[in-house]
Amino acid sequence: MQWQTKLPLIAILRGITPDEALAHVGAVIDAGFDAVEIPLNSPQWEQSIPAIVDAYGDKALIGAGTVLKPEQVDALARMGCQLIVTPNIHSEVIRRAVGYGMTVCPGCATATEAFTALEAGAQALKIFPSSAFGPQYIKALKAVLPSDIAVFAVGGVTPENLAQWIDAGCAGAGLGSDLYRAGQSVERTAQQAAAFVKAYREAVQ
């Protein structure tokens, strides 16, 4: 399965609160993003995610990250969540999410983990933490993976190095602290989002 959004960059808004969520999500969508992840270790995510789905679910793939348990998938499905991102391989989490029709992008680091995730039904993979492995590692791993599986670099990706990950065969990237840090201004989020979009478009020219 090819990645289903127009821009294969996932905005990871870790630590965002319900009061600021809509403004920051609006900023990244205005910049061109169409996939957003709210990690479940963010404050009051149970309020943020439904509000974001209601406001932007028709404009972007709205999802949750750091999903660790099948029962969390159940709760997220009831909220209308469309994307599940995990830091690890939990086959039941993957199967449960696929059963709800969600897109699942689990975190993996080895070929064994990658194929375990694919056997459970994952449609995409995130290599995490990418900065610990480097682009050449991902390039080698990609050589044994199905060609239609979108691989995302997550961890340490910046506008300045995004092209290296794309050149290594990544479809795109998950963007965390270089895009958004808890408490930063909406203007800063918009600025960084625009920088990432520009870097991606230049990388794929």
Swiss-Prot record:
Spell out the reaction equation it catalyses. Answer: 2-dehydro-3-deoxy-6-phospho-D-galactonate = D-glyceraldehyde 3-phosphate + pyruvate
Q: Signal peptide location in the record?
A: none
Q: Which GO terms describe its molecular function?
A: 2-dehydro-3-deoxy-6-phosphogalactonate aldolase activity
Q: Which residues bind 2-dehydro-3-deoxy-6-phospho-D-galactonate?
A: R14, T66, K126, G156, G176, S177
Residues flagged as site, Plays a major role in determining the stereoselectivity: V154
Alphabetical list of Gene3D superfamilies matching this protein: Aldolase class I (3.20.20.70)
EC number in record = 4.1.2.21
* Subunit and interaction comment: Homotrimer.
Q: This chain belongs to which protein, by name?
A: 2-dehydro-3-deoxy-6-phosphogalactonate aldolase
Q: Which family does it belong to?
A: Belongs to the KHG/KDPG aldolase family.
**Active site location:** E37, K126
Q: SUPFAM superfamilies recorded for this chain?
A: Aldolase
The protein's job, in short, is: Involved in the degradation of galactose via the DeLey-Doudoroff pathway. Catalyzes the reversible, stereospecific retro-aldol cleavage of 2-keto-3-deoxy-6-phosphogalactonate (KDPGal) to pyruvate and D-glyceraldehyde-3-phosphate. In the synthetic direction, it catalyzes the addition of pyruvate to electrophilic aldehydes with re-facial selectivity. It can use a limited number of aldehyde substrates, including D-glyceraldehyde-3-phosphate (natural substrate), D-glyceraldehyde, glycolaldehyde, 2-pyridinecarboxaldehyde, D-ribose, D-erythrose and D-threose.
Output the NCBIfam families linked to this UniProt entry: PRK09140.1
Q: Where is this site: Orients the nucleophilic substrate?
A: R14
- Lineage of the organism: Bacteria, Pseudomonadati, Pseudomonadota, Gammaproteobacteria, Enterobacterales
Instruction: State how changing V154T affects the protein, per the record.
Output: Little stereoselectivity, accepting KDPG and KDPGal as substrate with roughly equal efficacy. Reduced the preference for KDPGal. It diminishes the activity against KDPGal and increases activity against KDPG
The biological pathway it contributes to is: Carbohydrate acid metabolism; D-galactonate degradation; D-glyceraldehyde 3-phosphate and pyruvate from D-galactonate: step 3/3
Q: For this chain's UniProt record, which GO biological process terms are given? A: D-galactonate catabolic process
